[in-house]
UniProtKB/Swiss-Prot annotation:
The keyword DNA-binding applies. It comes from Bacillus cytotoxicus (strain DSM 22905 / CIP 110041 / 391-98 / NVH 391-98). Homodimer. GO terms for biological process: negative regulation of DNA-templated transcription; response to stress; sporulation resulting in formation of a cellular spore. The keyword Repressor applies. It comes from the Bacteria. InterPro entries: HTH_MarR-typ (IPR000835), HTH_tscrpt_reg_Hpr (IPR023488), MarR/SlyA-like (IPR039422), Tscrpt_reg_MarR-type_CS (IPR023187), WH-like_DNA-bd_sf (IPR036388), WH_DNA-bd_sf (IPR036390). Residues 63-86 bind DNA. Negative regulator of protease production and sporulation. Keywords: DNA-binding, Repressor, Sporulation, Transcription, Transcription regulation. GO terms for molecular function: DNA binding; DNA-binding transcription factor activity. This is HTH-type transcriptional regulator Hpr.
Amino acid sequence: MKSGEKDYSIKEAMIFSQRIAQLSKALWKSVEKDWQQWIKPYDLNINEHHILSIAYHLEGASISEIAKFGVMHVSTAFNFSKKLEERGYLVFSKKEDDKRNTYIEITEKGEELLLKLMEEYNPENNSVFNGALALRNFYGKFPENIELIAILRNIYGQDFIDIFEKSLENIEENFTEQEQKLVKK
């Protein structure tokens, strides 16, 4: 292989990317619904819960760290952290040796809320868990990344899998590569 040459085709890259995109969106829809239902009684949204959890597990963190680990924009992390501070769940601070960054720590009230949520977690209300349970029972462990398709099949049914596989087959059958570009046949 010459320097600068790719050891994959554009079509192969496109199919891989589309598969991951479609699986992720389907999985996220279930995760989001389950997560929202879990935290709704406590008047939290997903970002707020995630921030509380990160602050708890990191035993305090900068807004930048919250954004990074929470997979959110810094302004999102800051704004939702501010709302949590107003409700008494977080406190903001600056460090003597680092005045540039804003840090947050979970308060006792915030920790109590988070621990209550953890206590009240019910896996039977979690469609991703339930979708994976049959695999765990059979293999003795919960699925890893390779098993994502099987989880989605259990959540959304075979028709969903057939539809997304069909879309990938359509790319395979109806597109070709010309001058390192994917074009319709």
